[in-house]
């Protein structure tokens, strides 16, 4: 593959983000060759990610592109030349939200994404919400009794380390909160810790990961440690 002008422009940004090429499909190998695309480089995509593409991304749902941290969108002009559009509204690698909505099924979870304010809200389907509510009752760090969270203007979370099998973040929030991570949720293999203590990972927004985070400043890590 030869990089286009748009590719060269995007590659100057060395932060962590995703790129979406409007003319391509989710498995666009060219985009994945140069950038971290929403589909990745492998043809075998997680089924839920393909469904998200078909039902949301293909319909230009900007909120979903934002939650996937799509910072650059590659488009073509009338002459067929590619150009990169900067998406200033991308949610980033991780963010605190103010509210979780519970729905009854995966289908309803997908439908909720039609109008979800992904920067401030999350949606969890019933199967996952039962796990979530159970852990709220049994997790001693939790003082949460509902699904709304105070998010002060200084609340922050930043990505410190990014490797395929190890992610590290620093969070700071004066209130206990809930963080959505722009990383695909996988049921098996990934473990999350907050200050070294294992914490349950929730499946939010159909394809992403969520964590309940205590008040204060914390080191959060995800490690891929499959059981052999």
Regions found by a protein language model. Give the residues of each.
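Active-site-proximal, structured, solvent-exposed surfaces of multi-pass membrane proteins
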Residues: 71, 80, 128-228
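Extracytoplasmic
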Residues: 1-151, 174
